[in-house]
Swiss-Prot record:
EC number(s) stated in the UniProt entry for this protein: 5.1.1.7
Gene: dapF
Matches recorded under InterPro entries: DAP_epimerase_AS (IPR018510), DAP_epimerase_DapF (IPR001653)
Catalytic activity: (2S,6S)-2,6-diaminopimelate = meso-2,6-diaminopimelate
Active site, per annotation: 75, 213
Organism, as annotated: Rickettsia akari (strain Hartford)
Pfam families: DAP_epimerase
Name of the protein this chain belongs to: Diaminopimelate epimerase
Annotated localization: Cytoplasm
Function: Catalyzes the stereoinversion of LL-2,6-diaminopimelate (L,L-DAP) to meso-diaminopimelate (meso-DAP), a precursor of L-lysine and an essential component of the bacterial peptidoglycan.
Name of the top EC class for this enzyme: isomerase
A cellular-component GO term for this protein: cytosol
Quaternary state and interactors: Homodimer.
Classification of source organism: Bacteria, Pseudomonadati, Pseudomonadota, Alphaproteobacteria, Rickettsiales
């Protein structure tokens, strides 16, 4: 049986998403498989992550799938994209998005400036692999563990401030997904600080390298503040643009753009 699914494709600084309203999905769909099909850049629409949203009385629920069909707990760029989509559909400027019971407060200042308050973060040293497990990797790629920190921003991030070459970043990002290091995988952030700005590349679990990562920007900003490498406000720089970062009463707030790319119908064969 072939069915039609309405979709919107958007991106935040090149980090791209296929977004669908839950009301357009049949209960019989295998959502993990649907995510893999629609995310495929050759046989589907193509995206970094597949987003399902549902309207409730005073908030919007967002469900995130990676391209491998696994679920994700947070995505900052997708949140900005969804907030803009809701704004374009309804005119609402203040929007609450819920992801895995985490409340994200969004404000659409205009079509090119959407802010997201992701709340507070925690620095969970219990996530960090024991020194003997990670020492060989750190030594081989000259990673200073004193400048490496785990951040929980709703999803797990490891922020590395040591400078690595791009080819080494890929190797390290892959190796850190080993279950004996991080049981559920981890998002790996390679951060370099210049003039109070963080230049960032992120290996996202279940995806690989993406052109930008909003939650990674928030986690790296928080890590930079904690380690004294930057002060607020600051900016996180990606290949296709920047996110402006600030801290208010212990909450991390990012601001950036979100772009509408296309909308249409996807033909899904079960």
């Amino acid at each position: 049986m072939i069915s039609k699914i309405n979709f919107v494709k958007m991106h935040g600084l090149g980090n791209d998403f296929v977004i669908v309203n839950k009301r357009d999905l049949l209960s019989s769909y295998d959502l993990s498989q649907l995510a893999k099909n629609m995310a495929d850049r050759h046989t589907g629409i193509g995206c970094d992550q597949f987003i399902i949203y549902e309207e409730h009385n005073d908030f919007y629920e967002m469900i995130i799938y990676n391209i491998d069909g696994s679920s994700a707990k947070l995505c900052g760029n997708a949140t900005r994209c969804l907030a803009k989509l809701i704004y374009l559909d309804t005119g609402k400027k203040d929007i609450t998005v819920m992801v895995c019971n985490k409340k994200l407060l969004c404000n659409v200042e205009d079509e090119n400036n959407i802010s997201v308050n992701v709340g507070s973060v925690s620095f969970n040293e219990a996530w960090m692999p024991s020194r003997d497990k990670i020492w060989e990797l750190a030594e081989r790629y000259m990673i200073d563990l004193k400048e490496t920190i785990c951040v929980d921003i709703g999803n797990p991030h490891l922020v590395i401030f040591s400078k690595l070459e791009p080819q080494d970043q890929k190797i390290v990002g892959e190796k850190l997904q080993a279950k004996e290091l991080f049981a559920d995988g981890v998002n790996v952030n390679f951060a370099e600080v210049k003039d109070n700005k963080i230049y960032l590349s992120v290996w996202e679990r279940g995806v690989g390298f993406t052109l930008a990562c909003g939650s990674g920007a928030c986690g790296s900003f928080a890590a930079g503040l904690k380690l004294g490498f930057i002060h607020a406000p600051s900016m996180v720089v990606f290949k296709h643009g920047i996110l402006t970062m600030k801290e208010e009463n212990g909450n991390i707030i990012m601001q950036g753009s979100a772009k509408l790319v296309a909308q249409g119908e996807y033909y899904y064969e079960q």
